[in-house]
C-alpha cells in the first residue's frame, strides 16, 4: 500500500482552453460561471482553503463541479475516476454505436448493457462506457469514464417547473435561488440551448416534428427546453463534414462527432487549468476510512489497466472528501463503510431513499406518422398533463437509431411521474458487497401502473381517436427493458435532509460531502436530472467555500 501525497501539477491544454473560450464559457459576475481561461486566473487567488487537500470520487456532473470550485479555492485536489479518458477522434471511431456495440459499450461485461436487439451479443471485457447495475427489482445505468454520466446521458437538460420542484424537494432548497443563480450558471458552463429552428426543419429531424404533431393531437402544449449539445457540430454532421452522431440518433454510447457537451469538455478542463486539480483515470475507490484522532480521511484505491488487472494499490490522505461516484456507487461506498466500521459516525439514512425518478420508458411502433429510422436528436420538447386522472405527468420523445429494417414508424418516449416509491442500497454481509434493492414489481409498482395508464390514454387520444387503433400501440414490458425495470436516472441513497445536510455535508462529519445524484430525494420532479444535479452541486460548493473563507 502506497501513501500518496498529492502535489497536482497544472494541465493547461491549449486546444481545450481555446475550445472553452469559443463556446463562450467565460467568467460572469462574482459567484457566476467561470470558464476555462478565467478559471486558471481564479485558481491562483489565495483563500482560507489554500493548501488544504481534497479527494473527489467520480468525475461526472457533481464531481466536475466540485473539482472546479475546489481548484479555484486553492485546494489541492485529486479526482479519482475508475473509467478511462475518452478523447474524441476526428475520424469518428472513439465510441461504438447502438446497433454495433463492442467492448467500448460496457464496463467489463460480456454483453452490451442496453438495446435488446444486441443484448445477447458477445463482447470483449473492457473498461467501456456504461455500467449496468443489476439490482433486486430494478437495474440502473451509469456512465463510466472521465466525465462520468455526462458521457452517456441523453444530453437532456430541462429545468423542472417550480410547482413540481416544490412537491419533491425540501423547502430549504430555494427554487428562486436556483432559478436566479445556479440553473443559469450550470447552463452557461454546460453550453446548453434548445434545438434550433433550422435543424428542426431539416429532413433528418422529421421524428422531432412528428413528436410535436403528436403533442398537438393529444391536446397538449410542447415545452421546448435545453440540450447539452453543440448544435454547430450537428450542422457539420448534416453537411457531411464530421462523423454523424446526433443527426442519426446516436448518443448513449457517446458522441463520435464531439457534439455532446460532456463535462470533460468544460468543467474538467477548467478545473485542471487552475493548476490545483489532478484527474486520475482507471483509479477505483475501494474503501474510505476516517483517521483516528484526526479530522481527515484515507481513501484506498486500486489502479487498473484496460484489461482490468490491478497494477497498484494506493492510499490517499485528504482533508476533505467529496463523493460523486453516481447515486448507486456513492451510496454503496458509504453503506459499506458504515457496515464495516470504517466510517463510524454515519447515520441510519445512509443508502436509503433511492428512487428511479418516476421514469417509465415506452416504445410506440407502427405509428401513423413517419418518424424516420435514424432520427435526428436528441429531442425537442416535453409535454405536461396536469389534468391526468392519476396525477401530473410528463412525456418526452427520445431520438433513436432504429435499424433500417424497422422502417420509420417507431418512437421511444419517456413518461415521468412523481411517486413515493423508494428502494435502498444495502450492504450484504453474505456477499461482502452492497446491492440495490427496489421492492416494487411490475404488477405492484405505482410508477408502472400510472405509466401504463397514461400510455393507454395517450394512444387513445393520438391514434384511436384518429381512426387508427392498431397503430402506435405502446410497449412497456420490463422484459424488453421498458417500463420502470431499468433506469438511467437513479437518484438518492444519501438524501439531503436525511443522510446529509441540505448543503451536502454528510451527517456526522464536517469534511465529508455528497455532491451527485445520491443527494437528490429520489426524483428531479418529472424531468431528466442532469441540470438539477449540476445546479445543486454548484450551490453546495458555494456554501462549502463561503463557510471556510
Predicted regions and their residues:
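A conserved FAD-binding loop/helix module that cradles the flavin
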Residues: 522-540
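N-terminal glycine-rich phosphate/pyrophosphate-binding loop and immediately adjacent elements
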Residues: 45-167, 173, 329, 343-366, ...
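FAD cofactor-binding and catalytic pocket of flavoenzymes
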Residues: 123-142, 149, 153, 172, ...
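Glycine-rich loop(s) and the adjacent beta-strand/alpha-helix scaffold that form part
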Residues: 72, 83-97, 288, 304-374, ...
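Conserved redox-cofactor binding core of oxidoreductases
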Residues: 171-284, 459-462, 476-487
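N-terminal export leaders
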Residues: 12-33
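A conserved short coil-to-beta-strand element within the FAD-binding core of flavoproteins
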Residues: 281-295
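N-terminal secretory signal peptides
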Residues: 1-13
Amino acid at each position: 500500500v502506497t501513501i500518496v501525497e498529492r502535489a497536482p501539477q497544472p494541465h493547461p491544454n491549449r486546444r481545450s482552453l481555446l475550445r472553452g473560450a469559443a463556446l463562450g464559457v467565460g467568467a460572469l459576475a462574482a459567484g457566476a460561471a467561470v470558464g476555462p481561461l478565467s478559471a486558471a486566473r481564479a485558481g491562483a487567488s489565495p483563500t482560507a482553503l489554500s493548501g488544504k487537500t481534497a479527494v473527489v470520487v467520480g468525475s461526472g456532473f457533481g464531481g466536475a463541479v466540485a473539482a472546479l470550485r475546489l481548484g479555484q479555492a486553492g485546494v489541492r485536489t485529486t479526482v479519482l475516476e475508475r473509467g478511462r479518458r475518452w478523447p474524441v477522434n476526428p475520424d469518428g471511431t472513439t465510441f461504438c454505436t447502438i446497433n454495433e456495440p463492442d467492448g467500448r459499450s460496457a464496463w467489463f461485461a460480456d454483453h452490451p448493457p442496453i438495446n435488446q436487439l444486441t443484448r445477447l451479443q458477445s463482447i470483449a471485457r473492457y473498461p467501456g462506457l456504461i455500467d449496468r447495475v443489476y439490482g433486486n427489482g430494478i437495474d440502473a445505468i451509469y456512465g463510466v469514464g472521465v466525465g462520468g454520466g455526462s458521457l452517456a446521458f441523453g444530453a437532456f437538460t430541462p429545468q423542472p417547473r417550480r410547482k413540481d420542484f416544490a412537491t419533491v424537494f425540501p423547502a430549504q432548497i430555494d427554487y428562486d435561488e436556483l432559478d436566479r443563480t445556479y440553473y443559469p450558471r450550470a447552463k452557461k458552463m454546460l453550453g446548453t440551448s434548445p434545438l434550433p429552428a433550422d435543424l428542426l426543419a431539416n429532413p433528418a429531424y422529421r421524428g422531432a416534428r412528428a413528436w410535436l404533431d403528436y403533442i398537438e393531437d393529444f391536446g397538449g402544449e410542447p415545452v421546448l427546453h435545453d440540450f447539452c449539445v453543440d448544435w454547430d457540430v450537428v450542422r457539420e454532421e448534416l453537411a457531411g463534414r464530421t462523423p454523424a452522431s446526433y443527426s442519426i440518433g446516436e448518443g448513449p454510447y457517446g458522441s463520435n462527432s464531439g457534439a455532446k457537451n460532456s463535462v470533460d469538455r468544460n468543467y474538467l478542463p477548467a478545473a485542471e487549468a487552475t493548476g490545483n486539480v489532478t484527474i486520475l483515470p482507471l483509479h477505483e475507490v475501494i474503501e474510505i476510512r476516517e483517521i483516528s484522532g484526526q479530522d481527515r480521511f484515507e481513501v484506498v484505491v486500486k489502479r487498473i489497466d484496460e484489461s482490468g488487472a490491478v497494477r497498484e494499490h494506493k492510499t490517499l490522505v485528504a482533508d476533505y472528501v467529496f463523493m460523486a461516484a453516481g447515486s448507486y456507487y456513492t451510496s454503496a461506498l458509504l453503506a459499506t463503510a458504515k457496515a464495516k466500521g470504517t466510517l463510524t459516525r454515519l447515520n441510519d439514512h445512509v443508502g436509503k431513499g433511492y428512487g428511479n425518478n418516476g421514469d417509465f420508458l415506452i416504445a410506440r411502433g407502427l405509428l401513423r406518422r413517419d418518424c424516420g429510422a435514424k432520427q435526428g436528436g436528441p429531442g425537442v420538447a416535453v409535454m405536461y398533463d396536469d389534468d391526468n386522472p392519476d396525477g401530473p405527468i410528463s412525456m418526452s420523445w427520445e431520438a433513436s437509431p432504429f435499424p433500417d429494417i424497422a422502417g420509420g414508424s417507431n418512437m421511444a418516449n419517456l413518461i415521468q411521474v412523481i411517486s413515493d416509491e423508494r428502494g435502498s442500497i444495502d450492504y450484504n454481509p453474505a456477499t461482502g458487497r452492497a446491492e440495490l434493492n427496489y421492492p416494487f414489481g411490475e404488477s405492484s409498482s405505482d410508477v408502472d401502473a400510472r405509466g401504463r395508464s397514461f400510455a393507454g390514454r395517450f394512444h387513445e387520444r393520438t391514434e384511436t381517436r384518429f381512426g387508427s387503433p392498431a397503430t402506435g400501440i405502446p410497449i412497456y414490458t420490463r422484459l424488453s427493458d421498458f417500463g420502470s425495470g431499468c433506469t438511467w436516472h437513479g437518484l438518492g441513497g444519501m438524501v439531503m435532509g436525511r443522510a446529509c445536510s441540505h448543503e451536502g455535508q454528510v451527517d456526522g462529519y464536517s469534511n465529508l460531502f455528497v455532491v451527485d445524484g445520491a443527494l437528490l430525494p429520489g426524483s428531479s420532479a418529472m424531468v431528466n436530472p442532469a441540470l438539477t444535479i449540476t445546479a445543486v452541486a454548484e450551490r453546495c460548493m458555494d456554501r462549502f467555500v463561503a463557510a471556510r473563507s
